[in-house]
């Protein structure tokens, strides 16, 4: 019998809690990630008031310097720790795949200076369309169409760009390049980025509409991902008949592998929380696992190095945390964590190699305190033990520490 009938894992994308032991091997604009500290620096420079996460024990997590504006709790309502990454990457897919039990020893490729000419030329030859070279770099998806959409409308060229993650994105105005044509181009791009030197996690079709100054991306986005290289705990749950629910970009990250119910993309963190709450309320969801990603912290504020915006985004989540808890059942378990860091006060614009926080809460808890410090995959090992399935490659369960 399961200790918890339902477990809900919420990933606050990029909310790291201090430099990892191997941060000296990861860099931002030539600066090692050794002094990165997403939560610590936001608390220090912008102020951080997250009373609901503090109540669970966020401020009790072991750190060299306590979080400046997040108090410790003498009697927290949950259990907390921080977790270390073992995989050789600090991107979204690597973090999520490791959380679900995989050790990624061959990291995906990222392209901070844009994609090499060889790839661009192949896409041009296949599509019969030129590529706007100036867009070929890490770019905000809305900014890139604002900057190059007018030119695309005039010339029919492709907008090819990337991000901090191992992705190749192609934006196209639906009136200029039909969606089906864009999909064919993306399928081709997927076929040429499955091995080094361009091993990419996802190719993303990004259609948009509108006029210069008023472009909007449409719901016709399509992701061409790769599945995890071996079964994760998601697969083991699904194979055992345990329902799995994906909220936000989780389904894309795992290419649908091990997901039995995709609840759709999030338009924003707030929309994602709404979707999670609707998922919690589903009458058929009496047992199983929900997995939510809230990406605004990372996409809107971490990469843009905006500590005040990041702080406000954390406040928004914390304000809504009681709503999530109110829709849980007594024998539910809530796990709140991250997938990497993205210190908005740091050099560069890339993710940062950090520990991730872990907060565990259940109305059924009679105890509280610290979980032994471990690794990302301990989360999936705990989920696996609870539902009576095998772990994946790595991970040690902390289920026995939750009283």
Curated annotation (Swiss-Prot):
Superkingdom in the source lineage: Bacteria
Enzyme class name: isomerase
Organism: Streptococcus pyogenes serotype M2 (strain MGAS10270)
Binding residues annotated for Mn(2+) 1, in chain numbering: 13, 339-340
Cofactor note: Binds 2 manganese ions.
Catalysed reaction, written as an equation: 2-deoxy-alpha-D-ribose 1-phosphate = 2-deoxy-D-ribose 5-phosphate; alpha-D-ribose 1-phosphate = D-ribose 5-phosphate
EC code(s) of this entry: 5.4.2.7
Intracellular or extracellular location(s): Cytoplasm
Keyword Chloroplast in annotation: no
Primary site of residence: cytoplasm
Pathway: Carbohydrate degradation; 2-deoxy-D-ribose 1-phosphate degradation; D-glyceraldehyde 3-phosphate and acetaldehyde from 2-deoxy-alpha-D-ribose 1-phosphate: step 1/2
GO molecular function terms attached to this record: magnesium ion binding; manganese ion binding; phosphopentomutase activity
GO biological process: 2-deoxyribose 1-phosphate catabolic process; 5-phosphoribose 1-diphosphate biosynthetic process; metabolic compound salvage; nucleotide metabolic process
Matching InterPro entries: Alkaline_phosphatase_core_sf (IPR017850), DeoB (IPR010045), Metalloenzyme (IPR006124), Phosphopentomutase_DeoB_cap_sf (IPR024052)
One GO cellular component term: cytosol
Binding site for Mn(2+) 2: 298, 303, 351
Necessary cofactors: Mn(2+)
Summary of the function given for this chain in its UniProt record: Isomerase that catalyzes the conversion of deoxy-ribose 1-phosphate (dRib-1-P) and ribose 1-phosphate (Rib-1-P) to deoxy-ribose 5-phosphate (dRib-5-P) and ribose 5-phosphate (Rib-5-P), respectively.
Keyword Hydrolase: no
Protein family: Belongs to the phosphopentomutase family.
Gene3D superfamilies the record matches: Alkaline Phosphatase, subunit A, Phosphopentomutase
PANTHER family in the cross-refs: PHOSPHOPENTOMUTASE
Gene: deoB
Keyword annotations from UniProtKB, A to Z: Cytoplasm, Isomerase, Manganese, Metal-binding
Protein name: Phosphopentomutase
One Pfam short name: Metalloenzyme
């Amino acid at each position: 019998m399961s200790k918890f009938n339902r477990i809900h894992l919420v990933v606050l994308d990029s909310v790291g809690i201090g430099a990892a032991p191997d941060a000296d091997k990861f860099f931002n604009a030539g600066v090692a990630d050794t002094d990165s500290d997403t939560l610590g620096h936001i608390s220090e420079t912008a102020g951080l008031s997250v009373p609901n996460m503090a109540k669970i024990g966020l401020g009790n997590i072991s750190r060299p310097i306590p979080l400046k504006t997040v108090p410790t709790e003498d009697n927290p309502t949950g259990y907390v720790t921080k977790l270390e990454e073992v995989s050789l990457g600090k991107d979204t897919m690597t973090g999520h795949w490791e959380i679900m039990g995989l050790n990624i020893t061959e990291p995906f490729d990222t392209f901070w200076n844009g994609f090499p000419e060889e790839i661009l030329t192949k896409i041009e030859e296949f599509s019969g369309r030129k590529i706007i070279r100036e867009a070929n770099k890490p770019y905000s998806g809305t900014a890139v169409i604002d900057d190059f959409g007018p030119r695309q409308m005039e010339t029919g060229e492709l907008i090819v760009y990337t991000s901090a993650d191992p992705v190749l994105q192609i934006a196209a105005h639906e009136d200029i390049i039909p969606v089906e044509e864009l999909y064919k181009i993306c399928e081709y791009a997927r076929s040429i980025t499955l091995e080094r030197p361009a091993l990419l996690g996802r190719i993303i079709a990004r259609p948009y509409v509108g006029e210069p100054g008023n472009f909007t991306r449409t719901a016709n986005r399509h992701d061409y991902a790769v599945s995890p290289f071996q079964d994760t705990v998601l697969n083991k749950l699904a194979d055992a008949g345990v329902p799995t629910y994906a909220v936000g970009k989780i389904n894309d990250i795992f290419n649908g592998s091990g997901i039995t119910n995709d609840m759709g993309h999030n338009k924003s963190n707030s929309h994602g929380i709404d979707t999670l709450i609707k998922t919690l309320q589903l009458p058929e969801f009496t047992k199983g696992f929900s997995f939510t990603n809230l990406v605004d912290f990372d996409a809107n504020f971490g990469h843009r190095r905006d500590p005040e915006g990041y702080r406000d985004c954390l406040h928004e989540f914390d304000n809504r945390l009681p709503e999530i808890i109110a829709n849980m059942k007594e024998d539910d378990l809530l796990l709140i964590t991250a997938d990497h860091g993205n210190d908005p006060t740091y050099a560069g614009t890339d993710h940062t190699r950090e520990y991730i926080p872990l907060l565990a809460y259940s109305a059924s808890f009679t105890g509280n305190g610290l979980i032994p410090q471990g690794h990302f995959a301990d989360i999936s090992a705990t989920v696996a033990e609870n539902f009576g399935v095998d772990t994946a490659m790595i991970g040690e369960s902390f289920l026995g520490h939750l009283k």
